[in-house]
C-alpha cells in the first residue's frame, strides 16, 4: 500500500516508469537491462538517486538469515530468542527496540563509549536509560572481531578497548554499522564522474556533478542519509534544472529515531555550541509535567531548546518522548524563519496537547515555565 502510491503518481504525472538495472553508456546515454532485454535511452539531463545500502564487513558475512541487515531483520519468519545488534546508531536501535518488544533478548554492541554519537549527549544518556528499562543490554567500547555461523546460532567474538576478549552465542545478528552510497555498477568512473573518498557523488550547490548534464541527490551525495532530506533535494534539483532558485537550509534538517520513546533533534547540540564557543541558554520541560502526556500514559522524556544568549535565536532543539518527531516540526519552522524562543513562548498552544511542552521549554529559556 505504501509503495503502490508511487506507481499511481507516475501515471497521474505522465511519467514513464522503466524497471531494470541502469548504467551509463556515455554522458548522454544510459543502458537499461531487464527481463525483456537491454535498451539504450538518451536524455538532456539525468538525476542519480540510487540511494544507499548497508555497509558490509568481511569478518561478519551477511546471509540475511542468521546474520542480517535491516532488510533481513524485517523479513525474519519468527522472533529470535536472542538478537545481537552491531552498531548503536539510529537504525540498529530502531530495529533492536522493535524485536525487544516482540520478545527477543536484545544486546547492542558499539565500538564507541556511547550510543548515537551525533545525538545531544544529555538526550543520548536519557535514551539509553530508557532502552535499558525496556530490557535492551549494551556493550559499549566493544567491537566484533569475528563470527561463526552454525545450526544452533552465531558465535560472536568481541574485543573491548582494553583488549579483553569475549565470545557469546546469539540466534540472530543484525549488522547496522552504517550505510554506503549505491554508486557501484553505474559506470560512473567510466564516464569520468567524480566520487569522493566514501564513493559518494561530488556535487555543487545546485546538485550538478562535474558532468554538465548529470545531477545527483539523496543518499548518493554527501550529507545525512535521510528520506526527507532526499525529497527536498529532489524538488530543489528539478527547480534548478528549470531555472528557478530554490533553497535548502542544511543546518536545520530534522533527524528522528523511531523508537519508543521517539527521539527528535534539529540544529546544534550542546557540545557543538561549546566547541564553537557560542554563548547559549538552555530551556527544558519534562513531559511528566504535561497533562496530555500524563493522560496518555507517556510521561517519559523532555523537550530541550538551545538559544543564543544575546539574540535568543533558536540554535538547536532535542526532544525525547512520545511523538517527538511530530513536535520537532514547530521548532524547525521557527528556526527556518530565524525565530527566537520568545516567538514560541508567545504563541498560544492548544490545551491539552503535548505541544505545550515545547512552549514551556521555550519559556524556560528565561526560567518562566509555569508548570514546573
Q: What is the role of each PLM region?
A:
Residues 1-3, 7, 74-75, 80-84, ...:
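Rossmann-like dinucleotide-binding cores of NAD(P)H-dependent redox enzymes
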Residues 16, 53-55, 138-139, 194-197, ...:
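A short alpha-helix-loop-beta-strand transition element characteristic
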Residues 16-30, 140-153:
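A conserved short coil-to-beta-strand element within the FAD-binding core of flavoproteins
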Residues 19, 25-66:
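Glycine/serine-rich phosphate-binding loop and adjoining beta1-alpha1 elements at the start
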Residues 36-45, 163-172, 210:
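Core beta-strand elements of the Rossmann-like FAD/NAD(P) dinucleotide-binding domain
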Residues 48-105, 109, 134-138, 189-210:
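Glycine-rich dinucleotide-binding loop and its adjacent helix/turn
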Residues 63-80, 168-242:
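FAD-site-proximal beta/loop scaffold in flavoenzymes
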